[in-house]
């Protein structure tokens, strides 16, 4: 399962080379509305630029379809209504009808907006940022709030109800959740940077994400073979190695008392 939000043409071409002769072995999630301009990534809602970037992606990957066409990065309600009442959603539906994408998805960091997309009945996959720190935070249209130090300065108790409702709604409606930012940009792997004051392991972060309702996969970013192996270790990890609750227990500012964490300890 490969998520390709990045629109860098060199990256697309390199992945295309790696897929040669084994396309059917991979599920490819490509993003609509992510373009490459002036040698850098750009989010767009321009339908012509979106079409051009989509066709470039197919060409460089040497394929004639994407398994998931992910409408890229919709965090505000204004943007949601622009996308779902305009040419972008019509393009996504047309590409699906033509067989160029098999399933329509949407990526977001805001549970309110993500819920609107799920309730629209037009998406089958939701890419959402999930980890034990972000789950404490209330909805926001500003993604920077998720990792701002001041967001964790006060006492926080239990999973934010809007996030919890979103995960349960996805499960009820059969919407697959795939997870981004499972490591919190790497902060959760560092005792110094983690709001918990304790470092989690990649295995614990992945286990946390996979135990949320409706989660089907976790998109882990790796820049080395060692980082790749650290994620793969989840497959053979023991129950004790997967247990993420010790990191969260006994911290003054954080409490999950009387609230389900899906850890399975009560089973």
Mark where each language-model region is:
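Active-site phosphate/pyrophosphate- and oxyanion-stabilizing loops and adjacent acidic/basic residues
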Residues: 13-17, 55, 115, 207
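Active-site groove signature of glycoside hydrolases
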Residues: 56-80
